[in-house]
Regions:
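N-terminal alpha/beta PP-like core and its mobile active-site loop of ThDP/TPP-dependent enzymes
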Residues: 2-131
Length: 131
């Protein structure tokens, strides 16, 4: 990660965006939510990756999967926590069954900094395990 050599301090979201850029990601399909606003703020500064705003996470997932199918490059989709992440499950199964490369990004703040406490907190990794 040569881009880190001259960096004094970098956030996790900014580092993630730079890694996606290095991997050649051109588009991210998804929608904003409280849990991914920092990521989206840094994404808006990227001149290499364009956000394709969707109306629903499931649509974002299918767009990313189909992008992967048509280009052979990983399609990337973005959701917020809880129900937003569970809305990606059907498109994850579609991508897996069709051999389509896809990366799904979701966010979750530490519970102590969330206004809602544990509301909508799900173990997304366990939910995706069968797929």
């Amino acid at each position: 990660m040569s881009f880190l050599k001259n960096q004094k301090k970098i956030s996790g979201a900014e580092l993630f965006i730079k890694c996606l850029e290095q991997e050649g990601v051109e588009y991210i399909f998804g929608l904003p939510g409280e849990e991914n606003l920092d990521f989206l703020e840094h994404l808006s500064k990227s001149n290499k990756i364009k956000l394709i705003l969707t109306r629903h996470e499931q649509g974002a997932g299918f767009m990313a999967a189909t992008y992967g199918r048509l280009t052979g490059k990983a399609g990337v989709c973005l959701s917020t926590l809880g129900p937003g992440a569970t809305n990606l499950i059907t498109s994850a199964a579609y991508a897996q069954l069709g051999g389509m490369p896809m990366v799904m990004i979701t966010g979750q703040k530490p519970i102590k900094s969330s206004k809602q406490g544990k509301f909508q907190i799900l173990d997304v990794v366990d939910l995706m395990q069968p797929i």
